[in-house]
UniProtKB/Swiss-Prot annotation:
InterPro entries: Chorismate_synth, Chorismate_synth_AroC_sf, Chorismate_synthase_CS. One of its GO terms (biological process) is aromatic amino acid family biosynthetic process. This is Chorismate synthase. Homotetramer. The gene is aroC. Pathway: Metabolic intermediate biosynthesis; chorismate biosynthesis; chorismate from D-erythrose 4-phosphate and phosphoenolpyruvate: step 7/7. One of its GO terms (cellular component) is cytosol. It catalyses: 5-O-(1-carboxyvinyl)-3-phosphoshikimate = chorismate + phosphate. FMN binds at R127, A128, S129, Q247, A248, G291, K306, P307, I308, P309, T310, R332. The lineage of its organism: Bacteria, Pseudomonadati, Myxococcota, Myxococcia, Myxococcales. It comes from Anaeromyxobacter sp. (strain K). This reaction introduces a second double bond into the aromatic ring system. The keyword Flavoprotein applies. Its EC number is 4.2.3.5. Belongs to the chorismate synthase family.
Length: 381
């Protein structure tokens, strides 16, 4: 069986919950590593007041015993501390409070309210909120645990805030990863981070918001994960879909995908082989993916995040109830959440990679999967 999951919960409800199925038995789960990723998601220069309230941690309810997966479905919850301040407004048992009708451009408010026949966009924005990515990150941490067992590591780096973008072509080194994790902008260049902070400060001062981009990397993937056979099995399509499913992500680039103005001999990666290394490339312009499959080079995927639509200086809109012109309603929000989005990006990429590896190598016990990967790697050398 491959991986699947469902989540439920609202931004200010009691909890965000998930049920995940398909993890092989015997996988060791480091609970502190799960919570560490949740804390990483809360960090970042430009975040709003919500992050000062929440201290996210995952509570596992089923599917593990003694820190090991049992092969049964895994249930977990991330509790919302802020629910106490909103319980009269978002209670499952009663409806109260002012209706949210001043729908915000750039959000799900208007389309969701019209689609579901709602007179209060609160029911849309509570579920559409990026707060739901807390449980996504917890699920991604489980996928990372499986990937690590199979020799695959996933990390990320912010590469743009506003118009200031960089194009590193290789995964960060261990020292660079340490610097990235220590940075409030998730980057290993402090001079660049200072420029970005100034951009964020400027937007905050004028009541706006600012977007950017991040790269997600994966190392240790064998050649041939994914498939060329059907579009829905192509790993690049699955990764792009997973990243575009994250709130506010508007575009995805695989490798040097936007650099298509180059001639072919400057865009593709020549193939080499030697007995010790197997197949290898001098360059990685493809970002580790060719024909819908991994090519043995590090995976490199870039996601572009739009500016957060909720702004202190709002745009014009229409009131859902009266159809009269008005200003969009302000809800507590971030000025910039690109560093947090990078952590979410790691999670969804890790999930898709873990799923693709299980599709190829199967196994109800984690040791069976590991041995299958090792045997395959030896065969294709």
């Amino acid at each position: 069986m491959t991986l699947r999951y469902l989540t439920a919960g609202e931004s200010h409800g009691p909890a965000l919950v998930a049920i995940a199925e398909g993890f092989p038995a015997g996988l060791a789960v480091d609970f502190e590593a799960v919570d560490r990723d949740l804390r990483r998601r809360q960090k970042g220069y430009g975040r709003g007041g919500r992050m000062k309230i929440e201290t996210d941690a995952a509570q596992f309810l089923a599917g593990l015993r003694g820190g090991l997966t049992t092969g049964a479905p895994i249930a977990l919850a991330v509790w919302n501390k802020d629910h106490e301040n909103w319980k009269d407004l978002v209670s499952p048992y009663a409806r109260g409070g002012r209706k949210f009708t001043q729908v915000r451009p750039g959000h799900a408010d208007l389309a969701g309210a019209l689609k579901y026949g709602l007179d209060d966009a609160r029911d849309v924005l509570e579920r559409a909120s990026a707060r739901s990515t807390a449980v996504t990150v917890a699920l991604g941490a489980l996928a990372k645990a499986l990937l690590s067992t199979l020799g695959v590591e996933v990390c990320s780096r912010v590469v743009a805030i506003g118009p200031r973008e960089i194009r590193p072509d290789a995964p960060p080194t261990p020292a660079q990863r340490d610097a990235i994790e220590a940075s409030d902008l998730h980057v290993d260049d402090e001079a660049l981070a200072a420029e970005w902070r100034a951009l964020i400060d400027a937007e905050k001062a004028r009541g706006g918001s600012i977007g950017g981009a991040f790269d997600v990397y994966a190392t240790g993937l064998p050649i041939g994960v994914g498939s060329h056979v059907h579009p829905d099995r192509r790993l690049d399509a699955r990764l792009a879909g997973a990243l575009c499913g994250v709130q506010a992500i508007r575009a995805v680039e695989i490798g040097d995908g936007t650099q298509v103005g180059r001639p072919g001999y400057e865009f593709h990666d020549a193939i080499h082989h030697d007995p010790a290394r197997g197949f290898w490339r001098e360059t990685n312009r493809a970002g580790g993916l060719e024909g819908g499959m991994t090519d043995g080079m590090p995976l490199r995927v870039r996601a572009y995040m739009k500016p957060i639509p909720t702004m202190l200086h709002p745009l014009a809109t229409v009131d859902l109830a009266t159809r009269a012109a008005t200003q969009a309603r302000y809800e507590r929000s971030d000025v910039c959440a690109v560093p947090a989005a990078a952590v979410v990006g790691e999670a969804v990429v890790a999930w898709e990679l873990a799923n693709a590896l299980l599709e190829k190598f199967g196994g109800d016990a984690v040791e069976d999967v590991r041995r299958a990967v090792e045997a395959y790697a030896a065969r294709i050398r």
